[in-house]
């Protein structure tokens, strides 16, 4: 990857801007409950009826590990610290995605990963 390429620089600036702006997602809905689509299985069951989501409720505990559950750092409950937690979560997500991308490139085309 050519870090001096103007397109690469613009892309990196975009990623940095999105990481910095990501706390807006929590601040905009701070007093209004969960953001649209961020519901847990119990919330979905409450909205549409438990009989319609019994499979979802049953399978919800299969994957219980998340590096930063709810984009949060435990104990950081006030809006300022929650915003910092969102930013840290975004940085971790970007690092994991870029790492997965490079690992996949290295597996598929080892010559491309070296250059």
UniProtKB/Swiss-Prot annotation:
Top-level taxon: Archaea
Record organism: Methanocaldococcus jannaschii (strain ATCC 43067 / DSM 2661 / JAL-1 / JCM 10045 / NBRC 100440) (Methanococcus jannaschii)
Cellular component terms per the entry's GO annotation: plasma membrane
Broad class of the protein's primary localization: membrane
Coiled coil: none
Keyword DNA-binding applies: no
Membrane topology: Multi-pass membrane protein
Transmembrane segments: 11-31, 85-105
Pfam families the record matches: PDGLE (PF13190)
Keywords assigned: Cell membrane, Membrane, Transmembrane, Transmembrane helix
Protein name: Uncharacterized protein MJ1570
């Amino acid at each position: 990857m050519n870090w001096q390429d103007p397109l690469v620089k613009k892309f990196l600036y975009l990623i940095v801007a999105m990481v910095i702006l990501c706390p807006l997602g929590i601040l905009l809905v701070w007093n209004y409950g969960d953001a649209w689509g961020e519901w847990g299985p119990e919330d979905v069951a409450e909205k549409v009826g438990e009989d319609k989501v019994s499979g979802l409720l049953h399978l919800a505990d299969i994957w219980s590990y998340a590096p930063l559950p709810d984009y949060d750092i435990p104990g950081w409950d006030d809006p300022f610290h929650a915003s910092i937690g969102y930013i840290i979560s975004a940085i971790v997500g970007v690092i994991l995605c870029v790492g997965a991308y490079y690992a996949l490139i290295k597996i598929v085309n080892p010559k491309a990963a070296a250059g």
